């Protein structure tokens, strides 16, 4: 009895309770070990395994697989997914576009230079003829081949007589189902007529801006308009919303040329008036500067030095354009009187009506009182370029490079 009592006392209450209530049946499965519990597949791994099996049965094959075991000892092959391929970006920064370049007759030489600067630009031709009554008879060669292409036109509005025929081409090109259209007008000719000083004055700069703002839209959207060193900064607001004006400058050409001079470390920039200073001083602010202005004495307008010291320096007068050249010559004389060692000049647009370029003579090493050491102009006005080519003190800085770059914008 004592032995039976001790045995009964050693049994746990749960065991005793179970002995009374549990029915006979199969013994429970043993608890899984820590190792087998760790190997139990996650729902994601099981799904991946089923996916791999379905792909394999369907005839497809995965790029790779890993082995996963579950508690039942079944081995599942889970695919190792290859990294996603990132598609190449089209139109990324630095990408080049092929451009078909048309031009007016005056701009043939400059257009050829632009094409020589960039292999992505192709020269195209236009037949410029006239009817017996003098009106233009124009023909765009191979017009069907420019569909879907980027097209540009290099224009020169050197006189009112050529503007109409060029506008006819400018309005026709965007309608030939081209991808985009760019008008390069290096010199905006009515820029000096931008304001009214008396009732009845007509601001022809605004008139021309309105005409160019109505260039037809191409399939790619509004046309682009490239202009170099427009005379008045507010003229950029004369253009409507249907054209995208892009204002470039010829000053980088001047800066590169100045670096090539033997006395490049002795350069001072002079501005003939406050307008020129406002327009260009930010691009030339690392140079010493002289600012001139005009003052009225009786019936005469005299150029005076407003600020700066030209003494002993090679002074370069900078402006956007020159017509008769009277102000520039007066500025040259004042700088020479105040001790400038040399005087040169730069303008982006050399207009020189009535052969006024003949007023400018080279100094021939005799000093600034006798003439200019250099007179740099760009080829924005081709008729002037033909007149002053190979004549001292003139030197041509070509816009071909900047135009080629602008066509890739």
Swiss-Prot record:
Mg(2+) binds at residues 229, 231. SMART domains: Pribosyltran_N (SM01400). Keywords: ATP-binding, Chloroplast, Kinase, Magnesium, Metal-binding, Nucleotide biosynthesis, Nucleotide-binding, Plastid, Transferase, Transit peptide. The keyword ATP-binding applies. Its cofactor is Mg(2+). It comes from the Eukaryota. SUPFAM superfamilies: PRTase-like. Residues 1-43 are annotated as: Disordered. Residues 1-44 form a transit peptide. Its main location: plastid. One of its GO terms (cellular component) is chloroplast. GO terms for biological process: 5-phosphoribose 1-diphosphate biosynthetic process; purine nucleotide biosynthetic process. PANTHER family: RIBOSE-PHOSPHATE DIPHOSPHOKINASE FAMILY MEMBER, RIBOSE-PHOSPHATE PYROPHOSPHOKINASE 3, CHLOROPLASTIC. This is Ribose-phosphate pyrophosphokinase 3, chloroplastic. It comes from Oryza sativa subsp. japonica.
């Amino acid at each position: 009895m004592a032995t039976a009592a001790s045995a009964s006392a050693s049994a746990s209450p749960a065991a005793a309770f179970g002995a009374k209530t549990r029915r006979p049946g199969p013994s429970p499965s043993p608890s899984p070990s820590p190792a087998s519990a760790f190997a139990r597949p996650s729902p994601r791994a099981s799904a991946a395994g089923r996916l791999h099996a379905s792909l394999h049965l369907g005839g497809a094959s995965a790029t790779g697989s890993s082995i996963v075991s579950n508690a039942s000892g079944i081995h599942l092959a889970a695919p190792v997914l290859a990294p996603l391929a990132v598609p190449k970006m089209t139109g990324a920064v630095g990408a080049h576009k092929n451009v078909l370049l048309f031009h007016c007759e005056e701009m043939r030489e400059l257009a050829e230079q632009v094409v020589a600067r960039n292999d992505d630009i192709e020269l195209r031709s236009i037949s410029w003829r006239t009817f017996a009554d003098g009106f233009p008879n124009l023909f765009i060669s191979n017009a069907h081949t420019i569909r879907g292409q980027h097209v540009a036109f290099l224009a020169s509005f050197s006189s009112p007589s050529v503007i109409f025929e060029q506008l006819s081409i400018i309005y026709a090109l965007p309608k030939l189902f081209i991808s985009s259209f760019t008008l390069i007008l290096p010199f905006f000719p009515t820029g000096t007529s931008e304001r009214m000083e008396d009732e009845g004055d007509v601001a022809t700069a605004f008139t021309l801006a309105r005409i160019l703002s109505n260039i037809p839209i191409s399939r790619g959207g509004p046309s682009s308009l490239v202009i170099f060193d427009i005379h008045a900064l507010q003229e950029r607001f004369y253009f409507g919303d249907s054209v995208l004006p892009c204002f470039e400058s010829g000053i980088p050409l001047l800066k590169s040329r100045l670096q090539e001079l033997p006395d490049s470390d002795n350069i001072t920039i002079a501005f003939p008036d406050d307008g020129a200073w406002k327009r260009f001083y930010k691009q030339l602010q690392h140079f010493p500067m002289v600012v001139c202005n005009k003052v009225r004495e009786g019936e005469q307008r005299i150029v005076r030095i407003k600020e700066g010291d030209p003494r002993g320096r090679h002074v370069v007068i900078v402006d956007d354009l020159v017509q008769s050249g009277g102000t520039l010559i007066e500025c040259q004389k004042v700088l020479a009187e105040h001790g400038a060692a040399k005087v040169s000049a730069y303008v982006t647009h050399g207009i020189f009506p009535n052969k006024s370029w003949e007023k400018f003579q080279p100094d021939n090493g005799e000093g600034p009182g006798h003439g200019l050491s250099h007179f740099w102009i760009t080829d924005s006005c081709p008729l002037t370029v033909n007149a002053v080519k190979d004549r001292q003190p003139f030197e041509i800085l070509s816009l071909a490079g900047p135009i080629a770059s602008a066509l890739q914008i």
